[in-house]
Swiss-Prot record:
Name of this chain's protein: Nucleoside diphosphate kinase
Subunit structure: Homotetramer.
InterPro entries hit by this protein: NDK-like_dom, NDK-like_dom_sf, Nucleoside_diP_kinase, Nucleoside_diP_kinase_AS
Residues the record marks as active site: 115 (pros-phosphohistidine intermediate)
Source organism (scientific name): Carboxydothermus hydrogenoformans (strain ATCC BAA-161 / DSM 6008 / Z-2901)
Entry-linked Pfam families: NDK
Lineage: Bacteria, Bacillati, Bacillota, Clostridia, Thermoanaerobacterales
Amino acid sequence: MERTFIMVKPDGVQRGLVGEIISRFEKRGFKLVGLKLMQISRELAETHYGEHKGKPFFEGLLNFITSGPVVAMVWEGKEVIATAREMMGATNPLKAQPGTIRGTYGIDVGRNVIHGSDSPESAAREIALFFKEEELLSYEKTLDTWIYE
């Protein structure tokens, strides 16, 4: 099964959206295999968002993501990366479809509630940044036979 990294950003935590976001992923049939409430260090933020280094918004992004607690998660399921991207909606909430997480709860591109991996490679990299292998659980969900062929 495929895995993806999902993070509820400080705005989502402060607004009390963690439970709603987890609920959406569970209702979609995905399995939660890792979960942490944490404060991101500047060093971790710089590594995580390294692809944006040198861009005009980089410093603001680092300040925001380290401004409060986040909820880091690993979800598992069939095509979970692509499906999670659809569930989250466009990065800019003003362009996100109604009903998506960002379309429903996002304020602006800098306060868009949630981050999710965009490829299998980024998922593997981000999961390894935030979780040790022993922090991820493998287990059988009794519903799996009702969800997957």
